[in-house]
């Protein structure tokens, strides 16, 4: 007897070929001296490492507002990683999981994924939170336990971690020259969600979407900070060690090229970035940064980064009318890149259209981005109203925007009863109720309720005793409710 076996493989995600221009690359240099794994990222101990950053949200290439910095190093027996994670608002990290292989990902934590064979099937996960609790897994099998070290150090406004992962625990030899591993680093930040170095689509467990970690004894390249793009201007910094390295970076705005530069870095490099300006502010738009470092004759890049960043308008205004409550609420959102937020305030004003302001409110940026002001009905001019907000820096105006509202608290429909009727339009029929309902829970009451096309008979209970539709009974029997507690 012959047997035909059909194997159907459905990939979890579209794989990154080595040539994919959106796949991130980083190259770790020659083996060096092992750092002390204590959670303190000492610049001297990590001097020979290669940095990486450019974290984005899951299923998007949009840069995250919080950008961790990762450093990668190695010696003859280990891969080493250091991670520094800034935290919003200067807060301290939050971590509750204390049991090995517990829900570490729910805390402020970092996750490292390694696919030494780069076959998109076998991979390892190493996760740790801000108090040093670990989770390790082979693929999704968390019963696997590896021999590796992890230490964390918490601070106010940030935390850091260091990892030492033996090549032996990855069941592989030390990487050969120009070997390429599947690689990703992810960060979980309480209150902000998760971010990833390599742009996965649905979850961190997508080895086909891991980035590329290249190993070399003579070359190294990576990006350390993208502050120049995120802040609307400044510098992008990184490292490119080795001879013959050529770097190219492009900046696109809404799909059109805004800037392009080429350089031949040697060691640490700095790329000046200046976004197009709208007065004192970076011009609004969706920016795409593409950076690649390569060497002539190589088939693989040394470093590649592709990231998007949306710059919103510097000042946005919204207004909501609460007609019944008789108030108008205004809200301004400030994108104050490059400005001292402590010196900023917003002045709201109402005026008859084309006229002078009749009432103003002024408020400082208390939460860093949003300012609100409320106006009562007596303060709101009749007819068309001009609502404006002016951004102030140390009391001096630097940007004003406005919008016109038409009778926001006395709209034309207020008090109009057009369309309000107790009559039920055809083909629907009015609800008919017959019988007298007794007090709740009493026996013997009988009520018939006839909505459109059905007849519900109630006989003193919560559920109908019968339901009739088109002359036919719908219920096969009475509806009963049974409840039990502790088996009784």
Which residues make up each language-model segment?
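Structural preference for beta-rich elements and adjacent junctions enriched in aromatics
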Residues: 15-310, 319
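Low-complexity, Pro/Ser/Thr- and charge-rich linker/hinge segments at domain boundaries
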Residues: 220-229, 305-329, 399-435, 439-441
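Acidic-aromatic substrate-binding/catalytic surfaces of carbohydrate-active enzymes
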Residues: 50-56, 107-110, 410-421, 425, ...
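Extended acidic/polar, glycine-enriched regions
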Residues: 266-268, 281-309, 367-415, 420
């Amino acid at each position: 007897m012959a047997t035909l076996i059909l194997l159907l493989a459905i990939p979890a995600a579209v794989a990154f070929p080595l040539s994919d221009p959106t796949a991130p690359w980083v190259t770790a240099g020659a083996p060096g001296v092992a750092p002390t794994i204590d959670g303190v990222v000492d610049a001297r101990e990590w001097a020979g490492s290669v940095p990486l950053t450019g974290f984005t949200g899951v299923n998007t290439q949009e840069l995250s507002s919080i950008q961790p910095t990762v450093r990668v190093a190695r010696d003859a027996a280990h891969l080493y990683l250091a991670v520094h994670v800034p935290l919003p608002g200067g807060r301290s990290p939050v971590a509750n999981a204390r049991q090995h292989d517990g829900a570490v990902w729910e805390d402020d934590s970092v996750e490292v994924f390694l696919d030494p064979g780069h076959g998109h099937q076998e991979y390892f996960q190493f996760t740790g939170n801000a108090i040093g609790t670990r989770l390790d897994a082979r693929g999704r099998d968390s019963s696997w336990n590896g021999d590796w070290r992890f230490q964390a150090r918490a601070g106010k406004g940030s935390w850091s971690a260091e990892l030492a992962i033996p090549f032996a625990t990855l069941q592989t030899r030390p990487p050969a020259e120009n070997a390429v591993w599947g690689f990703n680093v992810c960060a979980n930040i309480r209150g902000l969600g998760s971010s990833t170095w390599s742009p996965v689509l649905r979850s961190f467990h997508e080895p086909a979407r891991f980035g590329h970690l290249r190993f070399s004894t003579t070359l190294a390249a990576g990006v350390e900070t993208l502050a120049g793009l995120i802040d609307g201007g400044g510098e992008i910094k990184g490292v490119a060690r080795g001879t013959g390295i050529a770097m190219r970076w492009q900046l696109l705005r809404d799909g059109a090229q805004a800037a392009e530069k080429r350089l031949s870095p040697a060691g640490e490099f700095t790329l000046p970035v200046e976004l197009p300006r709208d007065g004192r502010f970076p011009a609004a738009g969706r920016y795409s940064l593409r950076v690649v470092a390569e060497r002539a004759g190589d088939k693989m890049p040394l470093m590649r980064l592709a990231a998007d960043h949306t710059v919103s308008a510097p000042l946005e205004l919204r207004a909501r009318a609460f007609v019944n409550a008789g108030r108008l609420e205004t809200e301004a959102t400030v994108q104050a890149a490059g400005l001292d937020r402590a010196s900023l305030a917003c002045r709201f004003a109402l005026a008859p259209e084309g006229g002078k302001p009749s009432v103003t409110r002024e408020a400082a940026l208390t939460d860093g981005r949003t300012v609100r002001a409320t106006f009562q009905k007596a303060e709101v001019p009749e007819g068309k109203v001009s609502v404006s907000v002016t951004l102030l820096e140390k009391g001096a105006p630097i940007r004003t925007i406005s919008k016109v509202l038409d009778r926001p608290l006395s709209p034309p429909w207020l008090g109009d009863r057009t369309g309000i009727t107790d009559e039920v339009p055809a083909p629907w029929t009015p609800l008919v109720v017959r019988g007298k309902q007794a007090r709740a829970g009493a026996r013997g009451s009988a009520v018939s309720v006839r909505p459109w096309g059905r007849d519900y008979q109630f006989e003193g209970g919560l559920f109908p005793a019968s339901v009739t539709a088109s002359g036919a009974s719908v219920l096969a029997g009475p509806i009963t409710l049974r409840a039990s507690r502790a088996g009784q």
